[in-house]
Amino acid sequence: MTAKNFRAFLLLSGALVVAGAAADVWLLDRPLPVVQRKLKDSPTTTLTQAQLEALLTRIAPALSSEMRSRLGEAVLLEANRAGYDPLFVLAMVSVESGFHIQATSERGARGLVQIMPSTFAWISAREPDVGGDDYETGQDPVVDVRLAVRYFRWLERRFGSRDDALMAYNAGPKRLRQYKLVDEIPDRIKEYPRRVKREYTRFVGLLASNSPVEGSEVLLARAQSSKPVLTVQR
């Protein structure tokens, strides 16, 4: 079976749900429920391409200037499409790989956003406009990031909570549902949303101290307060 046929099979098989960044493919007895409301994290920072690239120079110095440019463009594009703050997307990339393009997990997740090959095949078939059919996971970091944002959006629609979607990205949706069913989510899974939020807060602070980005001072105050950040507006 060719790679493209395999991807088409995954897309057409309604029972398949692809697990998160560090998990396997799971077979579900029934499809996950879709949350019947719009989930949106309205960005409060207004970033230009140049500002995002300048930030990437500070937080990801190992990336080439060309890669920073391509990554910044992709993050702005997908964040705007999904209604996310681009700093949230960068926070996920930072936690997943530390911006190391060749990062590989023990379970086979690869790249900047640690996508499993099965996840990559499934979401690239589901989102053909990204062009993932021409690649395998890890071959083009920008394609990986674009597909990861769309995969996360898919998780958020089904779990209805930003924190739950983050945990599902880390553990896999089926496994997270099993943990929640018995009310025994491992601490390492619970910690994942907090790690993303810490990176988000750090990036907001870097922006506020380095450049007059619209909304950065307000966002920094929110991030440093006791109120949760990166919540879903209902």
Question: What are the residue ranges of the model-derived segments?
Answer:
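Hydrophobic alpha-helical membrane-insertion segments, chiefly the h-region
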Residues: 16-26
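Short, solvent-exposed mixed-charge patches
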Residues: 232-234
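Catalytic glycan-binding domains that act on GlcNAc-containing polysaccharides
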Residues: 29-225
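Compositionally biased regions
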Residues: 14, 226-227
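Iron-associated oxidoreductase/ferritin-like identity signal
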Residues: 6-8, 23, 211
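N-terminal Sec-pathway targeting helices
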Residues: 1-15
